């Protein structure tokens, strides 16, 4: 039986087409993926991301506990700030990537990938020492994401809180948005400015309807996972199971900025990740742009000089760039910009170039 978010009953009214994703029945699109993608790049789009997992970490030992498990330096956080980080195995493979919100002293909220929530909770629980309390609050929490250049303007119509005061990766808790108490965070997964809002599950439908109504004059669209994927892909934001996995390290995936091997507290996977940062990883995530006609898809093999050198992690025809592009994990010695490679597409080896990433970066 697939899980459903608190907004499932709203989908039908919005014309959603649903699919299975990580054990959830989720909307892949409402109008079309291209329309929704364009709405976020040019105006704003509203996503239901209530399938994501939320785990509360409290207790006097919280910081030491998180420092031991996280690649980033959690000690740099302050109340009201969020941080992107990862958890790794001893061999450097990735348990998950996540956001940490520091709500107060010894009070943290972890937001993890939907398909990994149970695995992550078990991993965290297995490493608890001292005064640390874990609580999985996923089922009672809803998460909406309003993303795009018009996001601040639209959301400001619903709250007296000054959203301009929120910098990227900062948040405020207990903000009243159209009568609903929410944690409002200036974060997202699209490459655009925007906000993620966490509220009680029972308040989600009212908040969803209020945001869409407030955004009507800006042509804000409800958006599904299809557009969320093409948007994050153009911005080269990783998806667990594709750019990250238990056999792909954060350094290989180009996420070394979130791996603080010099922090005082040793963390799981530190030795391998430190070596990869210092000596270079065996593989690197690169961008590829097709020369021949064809679309690189997840799992397609990549060749250089007749030798298999890696595989495509994500690929599509970019709605913004109108090009057939992909991300690929390849041997480090072939990961040079301008290098010609071949992608095996349905038994044919088609030419592509390695190109700079991210494919898309919004104008500041």
UniProtKB/Swiss-Prot annotation:
Transmembrane segments: none annotated. It comes from the Bacteria. GO terms for cellular component: cytosol; glycine cleavage complex. Keywords: Aminotransferase, Transferase. GO terms for molecular function: aminomethyltransferase activity; transaminase activity. Coiled coil: none annotated. It holds the Pfam family GCV_T. One of its GO terms (biological process) is glycine decarboxylation via glycine cleavage system. SUPFAM superfamilies: Aminomethyltransferase beta-barrel domain, Folate-binding domain. The glycine cleavage system is composed of four proteins: P, T, L and H. This is Aminomethyltransferase. It comes from Geobacillus kaustophilus (strain HTA426). The lineage of its organism: Bacteria, Bacillati, Bacillota, Bacilli, Bacillales. The gene is gcvT.
């Amino acid at each position: 039986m697939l899980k459903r978010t608190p907004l499932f009953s709203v989908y039908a009214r919005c014309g959603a087409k649903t699919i299975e994703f990580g054990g959830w029945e989720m909307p892949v699109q409402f109008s079309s993926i291209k329309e929704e993608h364009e709405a976020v790049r040019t105006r704003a789009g509203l996503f239901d991301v209530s399938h994501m997992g939320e785990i509360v970490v409290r207790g006097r030992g919280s910081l030491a506990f998180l420092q031991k498990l996280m690649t980033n330096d959690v000690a740099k956080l302050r109340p009201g700030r969020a941080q992107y980080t990862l958890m790794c195995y001893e061999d450097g493979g990735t348990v998950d990537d996540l956001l940490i919100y520091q709500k107060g002293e010894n009070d943290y909220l972890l937001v993890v990938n939907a398909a990994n929530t149970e695995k992550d909770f078990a991993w965290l629980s297995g490493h608890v020492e001292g005064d640390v309390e874990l609580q999985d609050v996923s089922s009672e929490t809803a998460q909406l994401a309003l993303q795009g250049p018009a996001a601040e303007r639209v959301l400001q119509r619903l709250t007296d809180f000054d959203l301009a005061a929120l910098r990227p990766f900062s948040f405020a808790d207990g903000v009243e948005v159209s009568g609903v108490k929410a944690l409002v965070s200036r974060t997202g997964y699209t490459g655009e400015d925007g906000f993620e809002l966490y509220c009680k599950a029972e308040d989600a439908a009212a908040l969803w309807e209020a945001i869409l109504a407030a955004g009507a004059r800006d042509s804000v669209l409800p958006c599904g996972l299809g557009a969320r994927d093409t948007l994050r892909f153009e911005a080269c934001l990783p998806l667990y199971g594709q750019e990250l996995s238990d056999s792909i390290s954060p350094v290989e995936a180009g996420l070394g900025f979130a791996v603080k091997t010099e922090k005082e507290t040793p963390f799981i996977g530190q030795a391998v990740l430190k070596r990869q940062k210092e000596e270079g990883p065996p593989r690197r995530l690169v961008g590829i742009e097709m020369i021949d006609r064809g679309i690189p898809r997840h799992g397609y093999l990549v060749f250089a000089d007749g030798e298999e050198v890696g595989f495509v992690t994500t690929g599509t025809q970019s709605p913004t760039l109108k090009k057939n592009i992909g991300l690929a994990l390849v041997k480090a010695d072939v990961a040079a910009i301008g290098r010609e490679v071949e992608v095996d597409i349905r038994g044919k080896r088609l030419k592509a170039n390695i190109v700079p990433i991210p494919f898309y970066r919004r104008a500041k």
